[in-house]
Amino acid sequence: MRYRKGSEENHCERFQEAISVSASSGVPAAYYSFRDDYQSIRMTAEYGGTIRIESIITATGEQGELTQHPQGLIQFRTRRITDSESNLNETCEGPTLLHIVGQDEDGFNVHLESLLARMLRGRSMITLTRNTEAYLRDNTHMLTTVSRDRVNDLVNQLKSPKSSLRRAAVRQLSSYGSSAVPLLRSTLARHDLDPEQQARIKSILANRVRIDDDTPTSLAQLLAADRDHWQILARRMDQTQFVAANDHVLRCGLESLSP
């Protein structure tokens, strides 16, 4: 990874911001802060480590925090400052920001939308999520179907004593593209995998990282076999869309969606 150590600050009448990049034992870390009349934000990120974004709304004191630990889910929570326990506090988690926005769009909009729009060069994370969800609802029949049982069979094949079978399993899993990513991630929770299987799965997942801009179509394929996301989306489906989505989930070998 290429990076440049140093610090930079920007102050004007409307806002103040600062960024600092350092390194310890060759591992870079970044710290960013932003403040205007609306909110203050702090973001810390260590390469290969934990990412944390903290937000405080100036007028209300409402707090938002997004955290992702290495190889872990993204966690997002908002807290209202009250004298008693508030049922307005929200906590959700998921493997992608689309899962987070799908569960707490209002909280994300209050605390993180403006920051993410700057990081995405003006693109709205909420708009991208809405368009992806619309594509999933309206084009369920066009999505790639990858069976969980087939993925598990190929993962088992990764520990075959024959190298030709192991290579064939890697090629087949890789050929599924991003549609197999949620299923491959879930297999890492299995307790019967040997170190070589785990390493091969992680290598396949690492090779699935894309450097081009995400689109609703590409993100929909990534989420095609993600039951958790389908369940989040089910709350905003009509009956016809729900039936089509549930049929697709069952074809992927996943559990039926809850109505």
Question: Where are the regions that the model predicts?
Answer:
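Extended repeat-based scaffolds of very large eukaryotic assembly and lipid-transport proteins
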Residues: 1-259
